[in-house]
C-alpha cells in the first residue's frame, strides 16, 4: 500500500519507510482485539433490557420495569445486582491489567493478545450457558480478564508497528473495531429479542465467542513488534520484522535507535518508582487524567445501558433496541472520520471540537428530558419528541467517536518514554477500567437520584476536560515515539518538568515510547 516514504522526527532525523500491505494487515488483525471490548459493551445493555433475561435472573427489576407510566421512570431499573452484572467485567479487567503488563513485557505483545482471546472465549461460553446469577458474574469476570489483556497489549502493538506519520490512523483501528463490535451486538440484540421461548439472550451472550476466536487465531499468526523482540533478546528477528513492516532494507537508523532505547530501558530496575520522578510528571498526569476524563464523558453508560436508557425515557422495547442500533451506526461512522483526520488535523483539534460538541449535546439532552419528565419522572414522549432526543444523543456519540473515544487510547499509548512505558500503560488501563467500573456500577442509581441532572453532571466534566486539553496537552501528531520528550520540553507548562538535560539524556532512543520493556 502506498504511504509516506520518510518520517520526519522532532529531533531532525528521518526514518525511511512506507505504509506496507503487511503492516496494514497486522494492525488490522491486532485491532480486532477491540471487537471483544466493543461487543461486550453493546451486548450487556441489550440483554439487560430483555424481559426474558430480567424475569429469569433479576425478577425484582423486571417487576419495576413493568410498573405503570405513572411511577418514577428514572428509578425503574435501579438495581446494584443488575449493574454488577455489567460492571464486574471492568473490575476484573482492572485487576488483570498488572498481570497483563508483565505478560506483555516478558512474553511479547502477541501472546498477551492470545491470552485475552482465550479467556474471553471461556467467559462467553459460561455466560451463554448460565443458569443463575453467579454463573453470569463468573463469566463476566473471565470476560474482564480477556479485556484486561487486550486493552494492555493491542494499543501498544499498534503504536509500535505503525510508522510515526500514520500511527494515529492505525492505532484508531482499535477504536473502530470497538465500534464495530458495539454495532454488531446491537444488531444481534435487536434480532434475538423477539425469539419465541425467551432464550434469545443466550445467543447474544454466547456469540461473544466469535470476536474472541478472531483475536485468538489472529494472535497466532501475527509477528511480534520489533521493539518487543529487541527487549526480549531477539535482535535478528526484530530487524527482519522491521524491514518487512517498513518496506525497505534501509532501517539501520531506526533499528539502532530502538536498540539504544532498549539498552537504556534495561538499565532501569524500578520503573514503577521511576515514573514518579519529576521528569515523567507530564506522562504520569496524562496516564491518569486522559482515561479518567474519557469515562467521565459518560459515554460508556450510554453504550452499556442504551436500550435501558431508551426504555426509561419512554421508548417501547423494540424501539429502544433500534435506537441503540442507530447510535451504534453513528459511533462507527464517526470513528472513520477520526481515522481520516487524526494525522492531518492532529489530536488537539479533535479533542477540542469533540469536547465542545459533546458539552452542547449533553446540555440539550438533559434539558429535553427535564421538560418532558421533570423531577417526578412521570410522563410519556411523542414520536417527534423522541426523534429529537435521539438526534442529540447521536450528536453526542459522534463527538465522542472522533475525539475522546479513539484519542483516549491513542494518546496514552504514544507519550511514554521506553523505560516507564509498560508501567505507564498499566496505569492508563487501570484508571480506565476503575472509572468504567465505578460509573457503570453507579449509573442507574445516579439516574434515579440525579434524574435529568445526570446529563448536566457529565456536561460539567466536559467543560473541565476540554479546558485541560486546551491548556496542558501538547500536539503529538507525526512525532516518532522515540522523540516524544522534545514535545514535553517545549511545552509552556511541562517544560519546567522536562529539561534540556532530560531530552539530551534520552538520546536517540531513550525517550522512546515504543516498548514496555519493564513493568
UniProtKB/Swiss-Prot annotation:
GO terms for molecular function: monosaccharide transmembrane transporter activity; symporter activity. It is found in: Membrane. Residues 40-80, 128, 189-202, 317-321, 379-386, 448-451 are extracellular. Coiled coil: none annotated. Residues 1-18, 102-110, 150-167, 224-295, 343-357, 408-426, 473-519 are cytoplasmic. Disulfide bonds: none annotated. Expressed in panicles before heading. Expressed in flowers before pollination. The chain crosses the membrane at residues 19-39, 81-101, 111-127, 129-149, 168-188, 203-223, 296-316, 322-342, 358-378, 387-407, 427-447, 452-472. Keywords: Membrane, Sugar transport, Symport, Transmembrane, Transmembrane helix, Transport. It is a multi-pass membrane protein. The keyword Transit peptide does not apply. GO terms for cellular component: membrane. InterPro entries: MFS_dom (IPR020846), MFS_STP/MST-like_plant (IPR044778), MFS_sugar_transport-like (IPR005828), MFS_trans_sf (IPR036259), STP/PLT_plant (IPR045262), Sugar/inositol_transpt (IPR003663), Sugar_transporter_CS (IPR005829). Belongs to the major facilitator superfamily. Sugar transporter (TC 2.A.1.1) family. PANTHER family: SOLUTE CARRIER FAMILY 2, FACILITATED GLUCOSE TRANSPORTER (PTHR23500), SUGAR TRANSPORT PROTEIN MST5 (PTHR23500:SF74). Mediates active uptake of hexoses by sugar:proton symport. Can transport glucose, xylose and 3-O-methylglucose. May play a role at the early stage of seed development. This is Sugar transport protein MST5. It comes from Oryza sativa subsp. japonica (Rice). The lineage of its organism: Eukaryota, Viridiplantae, Streptophyta, Embryophyta, Tracheophyta.
